[in-house]
Amino acid sequence: MIRGGDIAKGTVLLNKGTPYLVVEREFVNPGKGAAFARVKMKNLRDGSVLMQTIKTADTVEDAVVDTHKCQYQYKDGDQFMFMDTESFESISVPAETIGDKEHYLREGDEYDILIWENEPIDVRIPTKMIFIVEQSENYIKGDTVSGATKPIVTETGLVVRVPLFIKQGEKILVNTETNEYQERVNS
């Protein structure tokens, strides 16, 4: 059990026997009445989103989740294959669980996989990742106004808007939570 005031982003809670990942938490302390937390949670089984208000003094059930450090191997149909780096066991994660994170997966990279009741329920992607620009349009300097961007495609198929000076073959840092370009990376 966890107190409502102790709930943080990334916590996995149980709601009616289903695991939910806390994606946002806003603490509210009204002038009158008890403090509470407004929590936005993602259902880890079907991806639906639930908004819930929890008083800070109330307790909610937290899910007992194991975290396994795994290396991404390959995609086989609608399954993504990972290898546990400690036990060397294969872990198959369904495409529904991966969702829109597919383009952040790179063969050989390590990710944390959350396991609940012997079932993978989430793959944690690092907040920032470096990608190589595979496809990029070339623009002539002075062609547009300042602050202009263009779409590029990375080696994983991820599409990101970047400044016009980014060229094919360069490395860029991407914020995976917002899918936004952060900076060019010098190798």
From Swiss-Prot:
Transmembrane segments: none annotated. Keywords: Cytoplasm, Elongation factor, Protein biosynthesis. Pfam families: EFP, EFP_N, Elong-fact-P_C. Involved in peptide bond synthesis. Stimulates efficient translation and peptide-bond synthesis on native or reconstituted 70S ribosomes in vitro. Probably functions indirectly by altering the affinity of the ribosome for aminoacyl-tRNA, thus increasing their reactivity as acceptors for peptidyl transferase. Coiled coil: none annotated. This is Elongation factor P. The keyword Protein biosynthesis applies. Pathway: Protein biosynthesis; polypeptide chain elongation.
